[in-house]
Amino acid sequence: MPLDSIQHAAQEQFQKQSHRYAKGHILENTSDLAAVLDGLPIPADAKALDIATGAGHAAFHLARAGYKVTASDLTPAMLLRVREGAAERGLNVETREHSAEALPYEDGTFQLVTCRVAPHHFSSPASFVRESARVLAPGGWFVVIDGTVTDDFPEAEAWLHEVEKLRDPSHNRLMPPKEWRAMCEASGLTVAKLNIDYRKQPDLEWYFQAANTSPINRAAVRSLIATVSDSIRQEYRLAEEEGKIVWWWPTLALAAQKPVL
């Protein structure tokens, strides 16, 4: 299926930046995934699909847990990093190249579908949720971790969207919790966990480097930070520490189950 403009932008961005995600990246710490999976009744030999896997850190976590893992991504360079990383770790991870919105699997193929810190790049999050629900077996689990925005605070949402789009043009949208819940329910999934945590973004310069942000866009982001309203500054706890601009990023962790027939 041909890529749309948003998918093409994401593929182009991560094709160029794949080397930044393989080692020493913040996403190597998968304690967030472990927390949301904790207590879910997932079979020990479950077939798991990790969508938009990036460098494969979530997929490696699932493989270490004993699941039969397929790691998928839109970007060939990322999938190469996954294969290299799996080999280095002695893990068995299958890779597949495809978008998040059209999954090339039969209905009910997997007991677990995960997606970590990626849906804000998707052209159609609703299609992603619907397709994830389709490929889940009855009783299977859909698990998502991604940045989010506070429900019913459009000013803060618009500001963060502008910052993110300048930082990384492949960004599409961070969605509030109520929209995630609505998409799950519309796809026949029952939300069992929905938690919001705030993570410290400790250095604006690292934030730029991770996306190879242009000098012009870096200056634009700094201007947005310098002129931000008090309400948004408080929402994201924007501050300066030891000469570095820091803020606290809201992150959503969700687990939803496909009903048992």
Regions found by a protein language model. Name each.
Residues 126-141:
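A short glycine-rich, Lys/Arg-flanked "PGG" loop and its adjoining helix->strand segment in the class I
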Residues 125, 192-261:
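Conserved Class I S-adenosyl-L-methionine
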Residues 173-187:
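Short alpha-helix
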Residues 1-44, 57-61, 78-81, 85, 143-166, ...:
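Conserved class I S-adenosyl-L-methionine
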Residues 114:
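A conserved beta-strand element that flanks and buttresses the S-adenosyl-L-methionine
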Residues 49-102:
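Class I SAM-dependent methyltransferase SAM/SAH-binding core
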Residues 120-121:
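A short His-aromatic
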